[in-house]
Amino acid sequence: MAVNDPNERGIQRILLAEDDDSMRRFLVKALEKAGYEVVSFGNGADAFERLKEEPFTLLLTDIVMPEMDGIELARKASELDPELKIMFITGFAAVALNSEESAARDAKILSKPFHLRDLVAEIERMLAA
């Protein structure tokens, strides 16, 4: 069962999963300033529990996290809501997603460090698609 599409209400909602506290706070502040509603968690397991409760437009997730990594989170999230757009942010530029990773088929990867305007521009491109 797909979760309701938040775009129907015109709300651009981002679910952020990032285990680095300072990076998470920075991203929330910056994305809210850019006009997005952001709900953030420090691990994939908590983020997935929230995703089961309400719809989001985009999942923005680190790859390496405790409890549930970003790839597993993306896989489970896309099973729950196939329309959910997914972007990975990672400090491990060499991380490659296997082609069999169903959640990663249309996902974008942004390597840390990145400039905030690049992140916002990439999010805008994904949400416009």
Predicted regions and their residues:
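Non-catalytic signal-transmission and effector/linker regions of two-component phosphorelay proteins
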Residues: M1-L15, R117-A129
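Acidic catalytic/metal-coordinating carboxylates
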Residues: D19, N43-D46, D69-L73
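Charged docking surfaces used in two-component/phosphorelay signaling
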Residues: S22-K33
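Short hydrophobic/Thr-rich beta-strand motif most characteristic of the beta2 strand and flanking loop
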Residues: G35-G42, R50
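Active-site residues of response regulator receiver
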Residues: D62
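Receiver (REC) domain active-site loop signature in two-component systems and cognate sites
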Residues: M65
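Alpha4 helix (beta4-alpha4-beta5 surface) of REC/receiver domains from two-component response regulators
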Residues: E72, F92-S111, R117-E124
